[in-house]
Design a protein with these regions (language model features):
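Membrane-interface alpha helices of multi-pass inner-membrane proteins
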Residues: 100, 143-157, 164-168
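Membrane-lumen/periplasm interface segments of specific transmembrane helices
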Residues: 180-212
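Transmembrane-helix motifs of polytopic, lipid-linked glycan transferases
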Residues: 1, 68-93, 125-128, 132
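Specific aromatic-rich, kink-prone transmembrane helix
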Residues: 32, 84-87, 102, 121-138, ...
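Extracytoplasmic catalytic/substrate-binding loops of multi-pass membrane glycan-assembly enzymes
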Residues: 11-26, 37-54
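Loop-to-helix entry region of an early transmembrane alpha helix in multi-pass inner-membrane enzymes
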Residues: 41-45, 49, 59-83, 112
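Perimembrane helix-loop-helix junctions
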Residues: 135-139, 162-190
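Short acidic/glycine- and proline-prone juxtamembrane loop motifs at membrane-interface regions
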Residues: 40-41, 111-121
Length: 212
């Protein structure tokens, strides 16, 4: 992955996907006008916040291009997801190296990992929650950690709610306590709502104040 990352980083190339520029545009527009306009409906608040944060940090550190700061975060996300995928394979008792490398070196996976796009970060949070649900039942604050990770995944991309359904079904199959299942579902929904609400409240106030 590093061999592919270095030339992309040096050129500060955020990728050819228009969605990458739309995400950056959401942050720039908010800074310029104070108005939140989703990069694409229904919005990707966690990733858009991350873009804003890294743009600020990049400027503070004096990087030549703020895009380089974003690419560093994206690369670290890629590496973290690679490690997580490897851990999933390890838990099966068979490393299955061929399948692991087929995943982490597949063109679609690498392109997503080296572009400023939200897929990998959402997957990292979602699969981390699934990993805890499968293998870390004895962990302190198990339910809260799962809910937080799921909420972040949903905050990155709303369609990541699929991870919540998978984990709830998994717990039902394992005949976990129904109160535990309910707490995870409720906490995830509430936390996800908190992530989306400020942004849509900002957009709603803009439209009502300007009578659009």
């Amino acid at each position: 992955s590093s061999l592919f990352f270095i030339p992309v980083f040096l050129k500060a190339n955020v990728g050819s996907d228009w969605d990458s520029y739309a995400l950056i545009g959401t942050y720039v527009n908010f800074i310029d006008s104070g108005i939140y306009i989703p990069s694409r409906p229904p919005g990707f608040p966690v990733f858009e916040i991350l873009i804003g944060l890294m743009s600020y940090i990049s400027n503070y550190l004096g990087l030549n291009n703020f895009e380089q700061g974003l690419l560093i975060v994206q690369f670290l996300t890629l590496v973290s997801l690679n490690v997580l995928i490897y851990n999933f394979f390890n838990k099966t008792g068979n490393k299955k190296s061929l399948f692991f490398f087929l995943i982490v070196l597949s063109p679609i996976y690498l392109i997503s990992g080296l572009s400023i796009i939200d897929y990998l970060l959402g997957s990292l949070f979602g699969f981390s929650a699934l990993y805890l649900a499968l293998y870390k039942n004895d962990l302190n604050y198990h339910q809260i950690l799962i809910s937080v990770l799921l909420s972040l995944a949903i905050g990155v991309r709303l369609s990541n709610v699929i991870f919540l359904f998978v984990i709830l079904i998994l717990f039902l199959i394992k005949k976990e306590n129904l109160s535990k299942i309910f707490i995870i579902a409720l906490t995830t929904v509430v936390l996800s709502g908190f992530l989306y609400f400020p942004f849509y409240n900002n957009l709603y106030n803009f439209y009502t104040d300007t009578n659009i």
